[in-house]
Regions:
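Mature extracytoplasmic/periplasmic domains
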Residues: 452-464
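Residues forming the ATP-binding cleft of Hanks-type serine/threonine protein kinase domains
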Residues: 416
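N-terminal secretory signal peptides that target proteins for export/translocation
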Residues: 1-2
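Formylglycine-dependent sulfatase
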Residues: 19-405, 409-411, 419-440, 453-454, ...
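Bacterial N-terminal signal peptides
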Residues: 5-16
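Short arginine-rich
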Residues: 447-450
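Sequence context surrounding c-type heme c attachment/ligation sites in exported
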Residues: 443
Length: 505
């Protein structure tokens, strides 16, 4: 076994065990989970163009993981794979049954069997059987991947695992989910058991229709375009040529004014969500849970939104695979950051550790408690990112290698000098040894994960692509003003692909 193979296997498998950690025994756990939120959209992390006072408060009171990643996805619905990894603690390549997670103990399931009251609120995109197996109850559950934020289909989860009380929520999605979370906290004041409250928002996922006052505030003071904005992606990465709903939310080539307005709407969703985070944090204090509760704030992945000419998250750039992770709680020093490279799936081991619960056999990742508490600087030497059979990426320290097997193309970025991933160093002969080392590391990860994708092909596809003029019809979740603004008033196609009649809204 090579040295790099051994290092990767240790990184993925080394059991952290259940060891003592500073702070109270059996803390409550509140997991606040955003949808499609870029890592660079928290003001306290250096973005002066966005208003996030409550997330800023959370960063002042906790630790921020500044190099946190989603590991990628087996499908265009990256959120499904991301949530699967969090709930099972396994890399997506090691989840054989991606829908039902057969035979895999789920994080809330394990906590529930060890005395925790487990309750779910909000988005669940992984099927009813897993929801019912994982949680003892739930309110304001939105089954599926997305919805119009003003027309949220809601259900409640009973103790028997049934979904009941189907309704359309009267209010904005993030507000409805915060209301349900706050209601649950009010029921726990006299409970003698700790609780695990999972609140999965569907913001800032599109449709990007925040309440008008929130989007108008950013129209009046718009954020700049991303520093790596491009009208088109410069080559066929295997995904853009296939289309996809995310990339169809604006025409090619991307127009600066269109992307700027979509950024305003996206920021408006985040600021509105931030207010609901503040309400939940205040409710924790009101009900006496502030001192003995672990609060996790994270997102399932990032989003391009104009970066590299892309809109979606079906890629392996930093803007799409990195995502926020902020944790507050007993024993965690406030106003601190860590540059340890972490995965979202590490939260399984970490939260089991805080709960004093034995980690099930087969769970990947690391317990991050000592990273959060400042006594450990790092947990892994590299991170491996992958999207379907189209892209493979390895990051080690400041170097990041992208491999696109279908076109036999490599990109090497120095993230310290080039955090926006714009300058390809792969053709530089002085970097040949770096590429060789990173390919070795990548292959070691592939071997461990059972990833048999070749990194080159005998007959590569054409690299060049021009998507000028490509567009698509809006999906059923886009409200009328978005259809009018970005789709020329066109409507959702019917089952035969014909434009449907206009809806009056």
């Amino acid at each position: 076994m090579s040295r790099c193979e051994f290092g990767v296997i240790l990184c993925l498998l080394l059991p952290a065990g259940v060891v003592e950690s500073a702070g109270v025994d059996r803390p409550n756990i509140v997991f606040l989970f955003a949808d499609d939120q870029r890592a660079d959209t928290i003001a306290a992390h250096g973005n002066s163009n966005i208003q996030t006072p409550n997330l800023d408060r959370l960063t002042r009171e906790g630790v921020s993981c500044r190099q946190n990643y989603c590991a990628g996805s087996y499908s265009g619905a990256v959120c499904v794979a991301s949530r699967s990894m969090i709930m099972t603690g396994r890399h997506w390549m090691r989840i054989d049954d991606t829908r039902n997670w057969t035979g895999l103990p789920l994080l809330p399931e394990v906590l529930g069997k060890n005395g925790y009251v487990t309750h779910a609120v909000g988005k669940w995109h992984n099927g009813r059987p897993t929801l019912a197996r994982g949680f003892q109850s739930g309110k304001a559950i939105m089954m599926g991947g997305m919805c119009d934020h003003t027309r949220v289909p809601l259900q409640d989860l009973t103790g028997e695992g049934e979904l009941t009380n189907s309704r359309v929520g009267d209010g904005f999605s993030s507000t409805l989910f915060a209301d349900a979370a706050i209601d649950f906290l009010g029921t726990q004041e006299k409970s003698t058991n700790p609780f695990f409250l999972y609140v999965a928002f569907t913001a800032p996922h599109d449709p990007r229709n925040p309440p008008e006052s929130f989007r108008q505030a950013y129209y009046d003071n718009p954020p700049p375009l991303p520093g790596n904005f491009l009208p088109q992606h410069p080559f066929d990465n295997g995904q853009v040529s296939r289309g996809g709903r995310d990339e169809g939310l604006a025409e090619w080539p991307r127009q600066p004014d269109v992307i700027r307005d979509q950024l305003c709407e996206y920021y408006g969703l985040i600021t509105q969500l931030d207010g609901q985070i503040g309400r939940i944090l205040d409710a924790l204090e009101k009900h006496g849970f502030g001192e003995d509760t672990i609060v996790v704030y994270a997102a399932d992945h990032g989003l391009a939104l104009g970066s590299h000419g892309l809109l979606g998250k079906q890629n392996v750039y930093e803007h799409s695979m990195s995502c926020p992770l902020v944790v507050r709680g007993p024993g965690i020093p406030g106003n601190t950051s860590t540059m340890a490279m972490t995965y979202l799936l590490d939260l399984y081991r970490t939260l089991c550790g805080y709960a004093g619960v034995e980690v099930p056999v087969g769970v990947d990742g690391y317990d991050l408690r000592f990273v959060f508490e400042g006594t450990q600087k790092s947990v892994r030497d590299s991170v491996f990112l992958a999207y379907q059979d189209k892209m493979r990426t390895i990051r080690q320290k400041n170097l990041k290698l992208h491999v696109y097997p279908e076109i036999n193309y490599q990109f090497l970025f120095d993230l310290e000098a080039d955090p926006l991933e714009m300058t390809n160093l792969a053709k530089n002969p002085d970097r040949a040894s770096d590429i060789e080392r990173l390919v070795c590391e990548m292959k070691a990860w592939q071997q461990r994960l059972g990833d048999t994708l070749p990194l080159t092909v005998e007959t590569p596809k054409q690299k060049e692509i021009d998507l000028t003029g490509r567009s698509r019809l809006p999906d059923k979740w886009q409200p009328k003003w978005i259809r009018d603004k970005y789709f020329g008033g066109r409507d959702t196609p019917d089952s035969q692909g014909n434009p449907a009649k206009k809806r009056n809204e």
